[in-house]
């Protein structure tokens, strides 16, 4: 059984953000504006996206 995937793109800078938000972006595999990352659609990943929703956008589900 294959997991569903979710693709996220970084649209905001981590400069001046809290360390927790920087670490969350790194956990999502993002480090520069415009980069995308394809991740498995799990509750943990959804929670991470929700934590930094002002810095990322969901491109595809």
UniProtKB/Swiss-Prot annotation:
Entry keywords, A to Z: Ribonucleoprotein, Ribosomal protein
CDD domains in the cross-refs: Ribosomal_L30
Descriptive protein name: Large ribosomal subunit protein uL30
Annotated family: Belongs to the universal ribosomal protein uL30 family.
InterPro entries cross-referenced by the UniProt entry: Ribo_uL30_ferredoxin-like_sf (IPR036919), Ribosomal_uL30_bac-type (IPR005996), Ribosomal_uL30_ferredoxin-like (IPR016082)
Subunit organization: Part of the 50S ribosomal subunit.
Gene Ontology MF, one: structural constituent of ribosome
Spans annotated as Disordered: 1-20
GO biological process: translation
One Pfam family hit: Ribosomal_L30
Listed SUPFAM superfamilies: Ribosomal protein L30p/L7e
Record GO cellular component, one term: cytosolic large ribosomal subunit
Domain of life the protein comes from: Bacteria
Record organism: Hyphomonas neptunium (strain ATCC 15444)
């Amino acid at each position: 059984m294959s997991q569903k995937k979710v693709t996220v793109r970084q649209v905001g800078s981590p400069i001046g953000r809290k360390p927790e938000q920087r670490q969350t972006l790194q956990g999502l595999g993002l480090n520069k504006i415009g980069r995308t990352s394809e991740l498995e659609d799990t509750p943990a990943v959804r929670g991470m996206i929700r934590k930094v929703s002002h810095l990322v956008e969901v491109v595809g589900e």
